[in-house]
Regions:
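N-acyltransferase acceptor-side catalytic subdomain
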Residues: 1-167
Length: 167
């Protein structure tokens, strides 16, 4: 649900919003200005360790290489493709999350076939929460492989105190 309109997308503003359960998304055409601050009444939340893997997805995991924070800008650019249905990632959003990445708050998980980026996701990590913002795939299951890799990363000794918000 939309709870506010306005403000900037500076890292401090965005982080404070996440700490209060909000995320930014423009309310204009294709996510354009003004920026809206959203807090869905119901959220899609995954608990690390609660994901099931099909046989076909297991095969996909074996054929793709996964990395973390290696191609953040490329992942965001692929997610921002204006030809994708529901496109909402503007240049301002890309710059904001790029700054959050440089500060260590935003992260990406990438899937590769050889040297070609075929899938990925990005989001923001605050406390025990990873808020997944967007994902893309250029090959079947590539974005699912990155989601599984993220869950594996979050599934450590603190897993019982972590949430993955998939909005």
């Amino acid at each position: 649900d939309l709870v506010a309109i306005g403000a900037d997308l500076r890292p401090g503003t965005v982080l404070e919003a996440y700490r209060h359960g909000l995320f930014p998304m423009g309310v204009g055409d294709l996510g354009g200005p003004p920026v809206g601050w959203w807090r869905p009444e119901e959220r899609g939340v995954l608990l690390p360790g609660a994901l099931r893997m099909t046989r076909s997805l297991r095969r996909s995991c074996r054929r793709l290489r996964v990395s973390v924070d290696l191609a953040f800008d490329d992942v965001v650019a692929a997610c921002a493709d204006p030809d994708r249905p529901g496109a909402w990632i503007t240049d301002d959003v890309r710059l904001s999350y790029g700054a959050l990445h440089l500060l260590g708050w935003a992260h990406s998980v990438e899937a590769w076939r050889d040297d070609r980026l075929v899938g990925g996701l990005y989001g923001v990590s605050v406390g025990g929460l990873f808020a997944g913002e967007s994902m893309f795939h250029r090959e079947r299951d590539a974005s699912k492989v990155t989601l599984l890799a993220l869950v594996d990363l979050l599934n450590d000794r603190y897993a019982d105190r972590r949430l993955l918000d998939v909005q």
